[in-house]
């Protein structure tokens, strides 16, 4: 019993040591970064799928913010816990692509205003289920929490949720799926995923929104095996933040 208690105590101690000393503390970690551009004011990184952007409940370590803190730890006067520097925007854990990080308070203020005023250019590539018939289009629909499933967002009536606009363009039709380019006019949580589902074209392998269930009921064994192999190759929603345009703050 004594040994068992000591073991539990050791586990509890390790868990407590893994947590930050206070709620918002960022712990620098040596996690590789794919840096696309960097100067003394900002840097742009290509985030891989599967990497959580910001520490939170259950994800105190191993996030993009922890990696940024390590990369910038030798900059004079840099404080990883200063909200006036760091990430300017976010993308989902299982979405890959470009993010801009501000190194100075002035840069973060300037970039933040560009996002607020919707002057940035954000283009995504997405693989969606089905044959998207229109070559291009615009989806307008307020986005908010799904009252039937709080883990999902959904399109809501005009008097609910937040105004959201997504422009899309077909790049290539590939039979059962379509490759599209999506341009965000607004930046709501899960916006592209929700809007594409709203028009009947859920993202390929988007587990949260049913993009992994497309094979249910099919009797075509070879096709089913082929798609399952594709799921193994792309084990997350097929969404990539490909282009990020903004005016340099200096």
Language-model segment annotations:
Residues 1-12:
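Single conserved hydrophobic/aromatic residue that forms the stacking wall/gate
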Residues 10, 46-47, 68, 100, ...:
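Residue-level signal for inorganic ion chemistry
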Residues 13-61, 65, 133-142:
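Conserved beta/loop motifs at nucleotide-recognition and modification sites
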Residues 51-74, 108-113, 127-179, 229-230:
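Glycine- and acidic-residue-rich catalytic/RNA-contacting loop of pseudouridine synthases
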Residues 75-116:
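Glycine/acidic-rich beta-strand-loop module
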Residues 111, 189-196:
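Short beta-strand segments enriched for Tyr within beta-sheet-rich domains
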Residues 171, 197-250:
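Phosphate/ribose-recognition catalytic cores of enzymes acting on nucleotide-derived substrates
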Residues 176-183, 205:
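Short, solvent-exposed secondary-structure boundary/capping segments
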